[in-house]
Each structure stands twice: as structure tokens, then as C-alpha cells.
Amino acid sequence: MTDSSFDIATAIADVLARNVTDVVLCPGSRNSPLAYALLAREDLCVHVRIDERSAAFTALGLARVQRRHVAVVMTSGTAVANTMPAMVEAHMSHTPIAVVSADRPSRMLGTGASQTIWQQGLFGRYCTTQHVESIADVEALSFAADQVHINVALDTPLVPEELPRRAGQAERAPVGPGRLDTAPAWVDHGSVDVDLERDTLVIAGDEAWDVPGLEYVPTIAEPTAPTPFHQVHPLAARFFVQSEVAISHDGGDFSASTKPEQIIVVGHPTLHREVMSLLEDPDIEVIGLSRTETFTGHPTRTGSRVNATGQPRDSWLKICEAAGEVGAQTVRDALADAAFGFTGLHVAAAVADTLGVGDTLVLGASNPVRDASYAGLPFDGVATYSARGAAGIDGTVSQAVGAALAVQALHPDEIRAPRTVALLGDLTFLHDINGLLIGPGERRPGNLTIVVANDDGGGIFETLEVGADSVREDFERAFGTPHGVDVERLAGAHDVAYHRAETLTELQELLVETTANPEPVTVIEARTTRATRRELAQRLKK
């Protein structure tokens, strides 16, 4: 006897309740048995979104904070394909996610039936499909991989004669961040010996963690990495590529050998070309530490832990401190130079100045995450997230919403939801404006501020090779891409609060005001210029 679609959907909901706490559900006909079964569960938090692409990124934002699988459920056809960008980012950033797609019965494949595509294997190398046609298939499902695709063939009838009974325990205790027992464990690559008497620099990127034994080693940390004890500004990298430089420190001038003998890479750094170029220096030994199956670059030795001996030399610590201070002062001087006007870097600095312990920060993957790095992040007590897996701007508004929902769920008894701030460029904001499309009956963020550094186009291209004067004739059309969108009207259309800042002082005042008196969702548009971004980038590299 063939299992009914309702029995299969109920079994799927049971499996999800054992492996996830949150489900993002999209409307559709073919997945209606799944919708009924999931909405009947009192031990699952269901969020409804009408756009599958945004839904998948909302799930990804939830998962980044929770550090466990979050499911996104949709109907058949291109609805499934719309989750591909989020699946790619999840794979590249090792973030758990589960796509649960409804499918047509196999007899309908290749017949031209509506909303029928080949969904099995749709995600290719990024995720293996687990196909379900029966209860027995459901019982064999596994969440052992970070990325899960459950493809469920559902036949008619798709609507039950009566609604299913409530299932699960509504009083289920909230689960804090951390992988459930069914989720995959970190990969252990063993230990690597490290002599810290050699001049050592740590470069910590996304997915980095506090490595025992490296606590007091000078570290260039990207904003999504833990805050190191000896934090070195990324602009110091220009000193580390040289064998010897003249440095002023503590009132004295001296020459010093500034090239590290070894670099330890923790996690997945990507942000700064000058920093990444150190990994290609043949005079520097590179050691890679990872808790996943991938390593950054081509390290000569790899592991997940260190057996550290010796201590960093005092002279090396002073060199790193001096180089880092030069980098930080370079940024301060540039911010104080009125010739650059009001730029995205100024916006990042203002946001950084208002961050407090317990805040959550989501950074756009283009200029904002780099500007935040120059502004001094990471900060202790501020959980920072950015899409650094594939490093695309896709779905950042949705991820910010998901992160805010996850954070406030951890503090259900607080009168005011914890503060979440998203710093985005205008193109990143516009690219995922559907992230603000939340139904009136759905859970909404309670304290999310989205700061949009709006320079009317692709500001990052101003700093890249395509922004050079010699090839600039068609720059605005192909790369600058001015849009002239009225952000205030967009915010109003999505029923969120809106403020505009034309100057740094106005932005600072708005950030203070919205921190003290937050709306559920607030968009602050900072009207910036990109006309000086190339000159600003050149100033920072001097």
C-alpha cells in the first residue's frame, strides 16, 4: 500500500522536530501537506515567507546564530532553484541548513507537467539529495551533513479532509546556540607543533576560534573572528611584507626586521589583499588551522590545535604594536580629512562607535565588512556575522532579519529585544529588499537597525582596477550603476521606520537616538559619496 502524502508529511515533520527548532515555510500547492503538518507542530517555530530566495537566506541568518540546522520548505519547480544561492553560501561557510522541497511523483518527470523539474541532484557538489517517496525513506533520513536536501515526492490528494491534530510539546525549553546531537561534529585535523620564539603572526578570518596556546600572539583578525588580546590593524600588513622598516614608537625611532618568520592562519580570511599576499611570501612558513575539511591557501603544515612552545619576543610584540598603531592612525587621519567628504568608511566608524556589549552586528560582504575592519573590529562582546563563504552580497537583509530573530529568541523574558545592527551598502540593500517583506502575523525583529551606506551605486568598484582613469569611460554604466532609488519610500512600503543622515554628525545622533528608543525595524540611510573612495583607498595604503 502506498503511503499517503499526509502520512509522509507528518513523518517529515517528526524528523524535523528532532533535528531543528526553526522552519521557514513558503506557500505552495505541492508542499501543502508539509505546511499542514509543520503548522500543527507546537515544538517548531515556523516563519512564513513568500519568496523562496529570501526564505532560504532568512534560514541561513537564523542558522548562523544558532549554529545548527534551520529548515526551509517550499513547493516544486523553480521555487527550489531559488534556494541555490543560500545553499552555496551555507556550503562555503560550513553553516548548517536543510532545504525541504516538495516534488511531483516520478511518473510526472519529463511529461511537461507544471512546476516539474529534475530536483534530485539540483545542488550538485554543494549538497546531496535525499529523496523521499515513502515512510521508509523518511526513517532513513540523515542530518549528518552540514547541508541537507530532502526532496519529498507528494501525490494527490494534497489537502486533508480535516486539519491534523496538534503535535509536540509547546513547553519545550529554548535551545541555546550550539549544534544538536544529530548535527555533524567539527573535523579534528590533530595538533601541529609551533615554536612561538620565532616571530609569529596569526591571521584570523571567518570561522576562526580562540585557539589555546595562541592567546598572546599578535593577530590580524577580521570582524567575524574572535577579538584577540594583541590585535593588529590590517593596514600593518604593508610592514610585514618588508624585511626591514623604520618605525617610530614610544618617542623613539628605530629600524626593525618586520617580516614574520611564520604565519598561523585560523579559519577562512578573505578581506584584505595585502594581508592575503603574506601567505604567498616564500620566506614565511604558513601553518593552517581549521575545524572543517577546508584550509585557506596552501599551508605547509595543518592541524586543528597547536602544541605551542616558547613565548613571543618582547621586541616582536613591540614591532607588531607599533605597526598596528600606524595603521589605526592612518584611518583616523583619513576620517578627519574633510577632503574625503562623508564616505562608507565614516559610516562604519560611526556604527562601530555605538556598538555595545551584547549587540549583534551583520555586515554586508562588499565595502562594509572591509570598512568595519579598518574601523577596528572585532570588538569584545559583539557577535559579528558576514557572508564570507562565497562572499556575495546575496540575501543580506534576510540574513540580518534571521539573525535578529535568533538573538531575541534567546532572550524571551527581556522587555527589550537585544540590539542587532546591519551595515549594508545600497546595492546589497536593494538586492534583497524582499528580506523586509514579513507578513502581519509573523514574528518580526524587535530591535533591528539597518544602516544603508548609500553612495548610489557600486562603491567598491571605485577602489578596484576597473575604477582606474585609464579604463573609466564606461565605468558608471557597467560598474558604478547609479540607481536613484528612493530608500525612504521603500522603507515606507515595507512599514519600517526610516531616518536619513546627510552628515557624520547626523548619523552619530541618529544611532544614539535609535539605540535609546528602538523601533522593531529601522532603516537609517546615510547619504555618502563614492567620488573620493579611490583616493581614500590610496591614502590608506600609504
Regions found by a protein language model. Name each.
Residues 1-4, 165, 267-270, 274-367, ...:
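Phosphate/pyrophosphate-binding active-site segments
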Residues 3-73, 81, 375:
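N-terminal cofactor/phosphate-binding cores enriched in small/glycine residues
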Residues 6, 30, 41, 140-197:
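Conformationally flexible catalytic loops at phosphate/diphosphate-handling active centers
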Residues 9-13, 26-30, 34-35, 323-417:
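Active-site diphosphate/adenylate-binding microenvironment
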Residues 19-22, 64-76, 80-82, 89-101, ...:
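Structural signature of the thiamine diphosphate
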Residues 60, 64, 75-76, 82, ...:
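Glycine-rich, anion-gripping cofactor-binding loops and their flanking helix/strand elements
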Residues 89-90, 100, 106-120, 376-542:
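Thiamine diphosphate
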